[in-house]
UniProtKB/Swiss-Prot annotation:
Induction: Expression is induced upon exposure to amphotericin B, the allylamine terbinafine, and the azole itraconazole. It comes from Trichophyton rubrum (strain ATCC MYA-4607 / CBS 118892). GO terms for molecular function: ABC-type oligopeptide transporter activity; ATP binding; ATP hydrolysis activity. One of its GO terms (biological process) is oligopeptide export from mitochondrion. Residues 390-669, 1122-1361 form the ABC transporter domain. This is ABC multidrug transporter MDR2. Belongs to the ABC transporter superfamily. ABCB family. Multidrug resistance exporter (TC 3.A.1.201) subfamily. The chain crosses the membrane at residues 52-72, 106-126, 180-200, 202-222, 288-308, 323-343, 768-788, 807-827, 868-888, 898-918, 995-1015, 1019-1039.
Amino acid sequence: MTNTGILAPSSQQSEPEWWTKTQKFFSRENTITPTFGYFRLLFGTQPGKTDIALIVIGTIAGIGAGIPFPLLGILFGELVDDLNSSTCSTTQAPPGGYQAAITTKVLQVIYASILNFVCMYIHTGCWSMVGERLVRRLRTKYFHSLLRQEIAFTDTLPSGDVTSRLVSDIEVIQAGTSEKVGLFIGTISYFVAAYIVAFLKVATIAAMLMSVVPIYFLMAFGGGHYIKKYSSRISTHINAATSIVSSSLSHMSIVHAFNANARLEALFAQHLVSARMDALKKAITHSIQFGMLYFVAYASNALAFWQGSRMIADLAEGKPSKVSVGAVYTVIFVLLDASFVLSQMAPFMHIFASAASAGDRLMTTIKRQSAIDGTSSEGDSTISLASEEIELQDVTFNYPARPEVPVLQGVSFKIPPNKHTAIVGTSGSGKSTVVALLERLYDPITGCVRVGNRDLKEINVRHLRGSIGLVQQEPNLLDRSILENIAHGLVSSSQEKHKHLLPILLGPSLSELTEKIRQGASEDEAVAEQGDVVREIVNLARHAATLSNAIDFINALPDGLATRVGSSGAELSGGQKQRIALARALIRDPPVLLLDEATAALDSTSERLIQAALTKVSENVTTVSIAHRLATAKDADNIIVMQKGKVMEQGTHMDLVARDGVYAGMVRLQNIGKFSSSSSIMTESTQVDVNIDRSLTTDTLLNKEEKLSLEQGVLDEKEKPAQLYMPEEADSLPTEPEAKKEKPKQTLWATMRGSFPLIRPNLLLISLGLITSIMIGVSYTGEAVIFGHTVGSLSVCRGGPSIRSSGMLFGLLFFILAVAKFAAVIVNGAAFGWAAEKTLYRTRVLSLRSLLRQPLEWHNADGRTPGLLVALVTSDASALSSLTGTTIGVLFSTVANLFAGVILSHVIAWKIAVVLLATLPVLLASGVLRLRVMAQYQKKHQKAYAKATAITVETVDNIKSIAAFSLEQEAYSVFNRSLKAPYKSNMKSVLHGNFWLSLAYSISTLVYALAYWWGSQQILAGMYTQVQFFIVLPALLFSTQSCGQMFALVPDISKARIAASNIVDLLSIKHEGDEEYDKTGSKASAKHTDPRFNMLEDKPRDVEAQLTTTTPSSFPTKGMGVQFRNVHFRYPSRPNQPALDDLSINISPGQFCALVGPSGSGKSTTFALLEKFYNPASGSIIIDGVDITKQSGAAFRDTIALVPQENVMFEGTVAFNIGLGARPDVEATQEEIEEACRLANIHDTIAALPDGYNTVCSQDGKQFSGGQRQRLSIARALVRKPRLLLLDESTSALDVESEKHVQDALAKVARKTTIVAIAHRLNTIHRADRIFMIEGGKCVDQGTHAELVERCESYRANVIHQSLDA
């Protein structure tokens, strides 16, 4: 596909037509064979000339590396002829002229060894670079493709899919396109060269054996087809499981609050069980494929021995024959060795098939055509949106994730230029969808959106979005500095005055600037070093921050504009994030401004100031705002009222109120009232009130409160998600579960000991696998014995009948060996495959269990991000499981082969064996050095690309913001910069490691030379016979060749070693309640039983099926009493800044209380301490008379429910998500779930879905609107039947009608529940039993709504501001 957009290469070099056709051929999707799939992987990603040169050179060198060994067969054949021509006696020494021939042949072997080393180093180096360059190209193309895709595509993308593609699939592809390719080519070259030599020597035998070659390829490709099929199925299940892990680790506060870890773990286990069955089928298929290769190889040798013996017998009987004993020996020797080498292809075929399958999965996304490409240069880029009318004409729309659910139904209205149009309506009525269509994040199903007289589809997407300033309902910030986030608004600005800023915005200058400031440089000095353009950007950012009322809190931060906001803005409060997002929109000075609940997270005073600023800057701007607070919409020039995807009415505030229609009803529901001169409330809402407000002060107190909020740096827990991503520190601890300063590095012995409990349940399978591995290893020694006796029996001096009978006997023995090895390999593969999958299941479940049980403080530690912790459960667990799979099988068979060969050689001819054995330490040393180099490489590689993966995941998570501000090019630049340093470092490590790999392989040829020379010397001296020599020689040479294969597995062993250390570290962490029954469902059966490894079910229960256990009547019927006594607390990440300072409050059982105060005053921190996410530094928190700070465990949470401000959905059905709220020992029934949904006013919405309560929620519930997600969260809390209900802005995203329904439901619950609420909307708390005013971490006032209005000016000012009648 030709890319003409902003992310296309700056220059395109013309390519030859033949190369273009080659690329197109291998890129064809209808090519189904694994071979073409693999070539499609190599050539379908537009490799450059350097890549082609590396492939060509690596292929030639690989071919060259395979040629020397078959030539040795000719030398050995000549030796046999020399021996046979000298004497027919096996004890008589050859003549003295034999010494000169030995010296010549030894030198030839040494030359072959040097040639082999050079060729091997070249081909391993070339292919390693090919693999490194290929995965880098795939990373960039995959990331680029994700940036190009329309939002509808990412909406339907499984949440764990991106991580899986960039971690698991990339690792598989790199393993299948690196040095192993060169080794594979060398093997094929070896095989072909061996047959060429065989045909030159004895064409008849060679032709017979050639007939079995198609069987090799049939098994290789047929097995590859099924392996690919099962790999695809496994990937589907693993992606779903990864999604659960990712969403769980991203929302640990919810997991802890509801003790949901057991249910999430069970759902995770279900997906693993499904994947395990396909993985077992894949392992059996692979073992059959591998076993057939061995069977064919050994059976062909049996045929060769039998036919060769007949030819030699004819020669011995004087019949005409051009065949010599040496020629037959050469054919048997080279084809025997070729068969051995070919049998080593099976593991490579498995790796290549997996790589091709992974490549196809990536290429599916890479080649996908985007319906709305924000990077394309197509469309009109000259049209101006200033002073143009915007019109929706009969628009219908439904989201791709829910195509059966209509969102907009024939919507038509006009947005006049340079006017303020407000859109109000019920939750889920389509308001935010209208904004998405105006931004062209989606296209209408029917109808059109027009700007002036142009259809929106005719305008260049980037130009359109660059003319619009968007503030979303849930503001998303990228993990950069505040300065960079605000400056993102300039990247695609349509204003000509901003064009010259683009090179700086896309480069590293701003990142370098903020890094210098964080390291201690003053802002003025750092800006001066960067130049005038950077200074201009900083000034623009400051001006925008001033307009959005953010400048005061920014200046109060230690690093100011250079402060990193964390992942998704986690280091900032909700109100602060919203103000930064508003500054990002205003900095581009757009002709169109879209505000989707732009001030929903702000206190009343801040909202009023921002509204005034917006009024000023939007004098000549077309403004479209969405609001649930009608007070922010009443001054609009036109108000559009929507319900159920239709426009119900429109007009000015006064007109709509006068009509007494839908809008007037909303006004009556939301109006708090107006005040008389005596400050008494004239009217009150009839609603039942459940939430709170962050009441800020009047203008005179605003700066004071900003100081309280920001100079102290206090973050409410709701404003600070559990996971903080800190890229500058991430590399220091990518996956280790304990900080380095706390946890020393695991020794090898400690790692092995810690891993044993994971493997112990599978010891029977592993033992069976080890026994068959030993049988496979020893079979090579048996082959050497048969081979040696065969060579001795083919002497013409023995007579024809004897030769024929010996040939028949040893041919039969070889066939028996073929059958035995075939059976052993199948049993071996099945046993190790099943053991590996069971170990993988156990490791992943236990790893997730341990992660979900860690406290929030642990998750908040530096370097622990959800993306990096996911790797512990996915790639690390997979790497560890390989130690109970094929890797350990090959390792043990190699060791068995080595020991059996050494022992047999010493028994048969110890003088020859002892000299050859002396070379073994050299061989092993080269392998150990390779292991050390590769271990260091794997660790560096794992760290290096973690940041690039995190950037990609963050981009997908924030794709709507990326698209809305056309940040594709900026994100692409940051991503590419993150790849440069790791790429250079990895290339050096690869080239260094391949030196030792080549040496480990090539040194075996020198062993050939030494064996040839020393063995001949012993034969000359009459110490040993030819039979003894030809038993010892292949026995030891097969052993050394096996060692070479073992060293090829070094990278896998290295990965497993690192992974095992990481997982053992994780599982070694002790948790509160390990000695007791814990909420994950594991219970120690004895005092000495480690509860971490208990009760792992192979068939987990179906957590989607809701079962009745405990009846509601068994629950307590009164609320909890809560007391805070002189509580002091500081967040671990900010130990010098108090969050709570001597807080004391008292909440009686059954009361409805509210916490009110400025942003960052400590309100949500009280919720975090009530849930025991953290422990206070001092003071007491008493629930029902028990001080929870002095109690172990968190059983008290069983009767507490939390509704967070940021509503979280997990991968699973709607019923599952709501059922997560049930108490740990209870499964909510379907009736209870539906009742909770009715109370939350969401039942009808769910019932209208095609799958109803079985509708699958994607991570974060992207297919639901913000209000719908909030109602689902409320239902989840209500199904718990809590005694204490914590509501953190629980109705902020609801329309007034839904809010009334919810509050009516909460009024029923309040009779036997204590409710504590935080809210901005004062109309939701004015009937609270007690309202606590929190400022600076203290309770500065308390009372009823009326009492606070009378004596607290700031509270009264907020009431006035929120009143529509004011």
